[in-house]
């Protein structure tokens, strides 16, 4: 399948607020204490849209050692309002690996479109989760044992001249629906210290989720959103290029500006700007949240009404016409809104009233 036909241009983060935003403003007009900047509590689960929940759950649990924590079904009008997709009937599974979790969602109705088979790592709908491993050779051998579709030619070790990333080993591959995933190994002195603690307590090499990475067209524009609006902090930067990078992401001649952001807990978010080549395609402007390429990131924040007011003030693009209960996604009792970043990536901004450390 080629790219879906593009429709109207995507609204940038600085354009006029759409009618749904004006409706939210009316609903939240009594909020006080609007923060100058949102302070997120955590980056929550990454949500992957799958075509067959049973198949996807089997892949993640049997191949990658995730554990199924919960499954549920829903066909609520409130979920239609949250997602901007009418007539939803969904199945959701929450899967855990270490301290992190992902949510797999199958839209039984309406069915979304598949991931374009010619998708590349520099296309701007690209989003992966990075799974930390204690032993790259053992982890990659397990993938090959299950005939997993690779993106990388083989596991790559980043070169010594790249001081911020030297010695890190990584491998890109795909799940059964074509979602890109990454295995990542941190040598001593690199990565979060927790990845080097208690590794012997796990049966296999898969430890947890370090970050989700998204392709962006302009790092500075994206920092204006993720750092300046959403309140994430920059914790690292790197410029990756050379044969190892080309073979890792399977993009010839790639020079990638990588910016790492974090909240107080949960996985990080990495911005990937391909300085070369510049032929990555923008996300289709008619993308819906049930399309399989439309992964979404959960961001959990306090002072929810005031934070939503701040998003409105910053003219962020809203999908939800007003805050809704997020179930079957997220925490029980949580409310949220679905928004888009400047490149079209979806974010579920969720209230933190019932949040607890995962």
At which residue positions do the language-model features occur?
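Extended intrinsically disordered, low-complexity coil regions enriched in Ser, Thr, Gly, Ala
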Residues: 54, 58, 62-74, 109-110, ...
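Vicinal oxygen chelate
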Residues: 37-38, 41-51, 71, 90-104, 108-109, 115-207, ...
């Amino acid at each position: 399948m080629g790219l879906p036909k593009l429709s109207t241009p995507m609204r940038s983060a600085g354009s006029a607020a759409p009618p749904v935003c004006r409706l939210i403003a009316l609903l939240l007009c009594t909020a006080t204490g609007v923060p100058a900047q949102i302070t997120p509590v955590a980056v929550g689960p990454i949500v992957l849209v799958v075509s067959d929940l049973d198949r996807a759950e089997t892949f993640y649990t049997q191949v990658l050692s995730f554990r199924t924590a919960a499954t549920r079904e829903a066909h609520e009008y409130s979920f239609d309002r949250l997602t901007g997709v009418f007539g939803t009937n969904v199945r959701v599974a929450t899967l855990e690996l270490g301290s992190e979790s992902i949510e797999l969602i199958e839209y039984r109705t309406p069915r979304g479109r598949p991931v374009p088979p010619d998708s590349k790592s520099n296309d701007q709908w690209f989003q992966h989760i990075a799974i930390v491993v204690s032993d790259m050779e053992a982890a990659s051998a397990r993938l090959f044992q299950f005939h997993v579709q690779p993106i990388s030619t083989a596991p790559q070790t980043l070169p010594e001249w790249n001081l911020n990333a030297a010695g890190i080993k990584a491998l890109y591959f795909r799940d059964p629906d074509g979602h890109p995933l990454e295995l990542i190994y941190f040598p001593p002195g690199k990565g979060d210290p927790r990845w080097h603690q208690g590794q012997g307590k796990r049966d296999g090499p898969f430890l947890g989720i370090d970050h989700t990475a998204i392709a962006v067209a302009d790092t500075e524009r994206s920092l204006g959103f993720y750092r300046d609006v959403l309140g994430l902090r920059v914790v690292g930067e790197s410029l990756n290029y050379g044969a190892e990078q080309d073979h890792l992401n399977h993009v010839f001649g790639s020079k990638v500006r990588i910016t790492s952001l974090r909240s107080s807990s949960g996985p990080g978010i990495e911005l990937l700007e391909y300085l070369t080549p510049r032929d990555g395609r923008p996300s289709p402007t008619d993308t819906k949240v049930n399309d399989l390429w439309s992964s979404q990131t959960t961001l959990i924040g306090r002072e929810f009404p005031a934070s939503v007011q701040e998003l409105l003030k910053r003219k962020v693009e809203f999908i939800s016409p007003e805050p809704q209960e997020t179930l079957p996604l997220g925490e029980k009792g949580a409310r949220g809104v679905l928004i888009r970043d400047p490149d079209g990536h979806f974010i579920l901004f969720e209230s933190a009233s019932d949040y607890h450390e995962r």
